[in-house]
Amino acid sequence: MGMSPLTVKKLGFIFMIVSASALSVSFAGRPSIFVHKKINLREEMVERSMHEHERLLRMNTKDYGNNSPSPRLERPPFKLIPN
């Protein structure tokens, strides 16, 4: 009672379709735990503003000291030379 190669291919294809659909259904479960996590907006805003303030302090060096390189090429601000 041997099975023909065509029957084996058909059964394999049907098994592949069923297993792929079962896998996709299993991934479509409930939302992630991060959706239900309560976010404290006040702490997040304070943290974000502290980060922005630090970034602005590093960026606003108007002298010829060490500063982070500018993303565009521009001349440094002119400093008067005392006579």
UniProtKB/Swiss-Prot annotation:
What are the protein's GO molecular function terms? Answer: hormone activity
Where is the segment annotated Disordered? 59-83
Q: Which GO terms describe its cellular component?
A: Casparian strip
Expression sites (tissue/organ) = Expressed exclusively in the root stele.
Q: What happens when the gene is disrupted?
A: No detectable phenotype in cif1-1. The double mutant cif1-1 cif2-1 is defective in ion homeostasis in the xylem due to defect in endodermal barrier formation in the roots. Highly sensitive to excess iron. Retarded growth under low-potassium conditions. Repeatedly interrupted, discontinuous Casparian strip due to patch-like localization of the CASPs proteins. Reduced rosette leaf size.
Question: What is known about its induction?
Answer: Induced by excess iron and further synergistically regulated by lowering the medium pH.
Disulphide bonds annotated for this chain are: none
Q: Keywords in UniProt for this one?
A: Cell wall biogenesis/degradation, Developmental protein, Hormone, Hydroxylation, Signal, Sulfation
Q: Which region is the signal sequence?
A: 1-22
Positions of modified residues (Hydroxyproline): 69, 71
The Gene Ontology biological process terms listed for this entry are: Casparian strip assembly; regulation of root morphogenesis
According to the UniProt record, list the residues that bear Sulfotyrosine.
Answer: 64
- So what does this one do? Peptide hormone required for contiguous Casparian strip diffusion barrier formation in roots via the regulation of CASPs protein expression and distribution in a GSO1-GSO2 signaling pathway. The Casparian strip is required for ion homeostasis (e.g. iron and potassium ions).
What subunit structure does UniProt give? Interacts with the specific receptor kinases GSO1 and GSO2.
- PANTHER family per the record? PROTEIN CASPARIAN STRIP INTEGRITY FACTOR 1, PROTEIN CASPARIAN STRIP INTEGRITY FACTOR 1-RELATED
Quote the protein name from its UniProt record. Protein CASPARIAN STRIP INTEGRITY FACTOR 1
